[in-house]
């Protein structure tokens, strides 16, 4: 009986080893413990997995991280160097880096840390961050949050270094089935002390969030500090960053991500536990008004109107034929000169009918603002006294913003946004009910308007 039991034990042990070899999950990668194509690295909570996957309509193999299932891949290592078979291995190299090897033991991807210890290991944190650390000290040498793919996770920071310009940014997939680096990227940009989130198509600006006020991006219509939970700012080490958190009490239901898709749309997704898939909550592009500067300069875009583009009051289309064909990118030009310009050009005295401001409510303010830390009254007077100032806006957390060039990428919202004051000639501002100047002289319905006129006469 003893001999029979021993044989049974050996048989079961060999069988278990075989099963583990074809589909085992480990929690740490070391130089002696690698993962092959059929194996995975799993976070302690079981939510995140590192392993090999093949996208739909593809035969290539990639090493990636996914949430719950391979339908939600959030990070890819060898994006531009796919494997063409199942011979790949993820291991720690002799120099201490985490690497992906092909069947010929050639390195096709590496963490590429220049100064490493020979005693390193790689594992997950429960936030989904893959780290490479010194085994003895725990000192982190590299982590996947510093080199994201197309997905922003809770706790992951998008950042830009003010001195070097180095960015932590998202880059889209080439297509829904090809994780190689695509045409679109999303990153923070700081210009004249104003921080915004941009999406680029190559080097061309495709979408912008509006100025960051320390809690929200003011150009995202339905963003709120309470709902979105974004934080960030200057970290004291020369970096500007933003990140968000979700409550751990919500469990999987609280898992929320931002994913930049292959068409350049930044999507907010949350985990639908019932459907066992990610559901869409918000997207950066809902209409053509979300495309950067689609209406050109000195125009406003309203997705609820037809046509969507209109010249601001006091302006007319630069090219009327193009405007009639709904080609708006040439924008609008002022149809009546400003008083301050006439005074400056003719060296005459100012008359009683001075320039004023048209107030546009609940809008995404234009690109290229200049910032100054003054109160609303001073903000207005500064702009009025500067003939080059064409508009201003004041936001409690940002302060005074002013514009001296073309007004680009103004968008009308039905809620939130900021109030923008556009400089206009007195003769244009005195007709209080004419809010926008369509080329065909049509009007929006009153319920869709969020503008009013205020006249701010300069006190002499």
Regions found by a protein language model. Give the residues of each.
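Beta-rich ligand-binding surfaces for carbohydrates and other polyanions
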Residues: 2-460
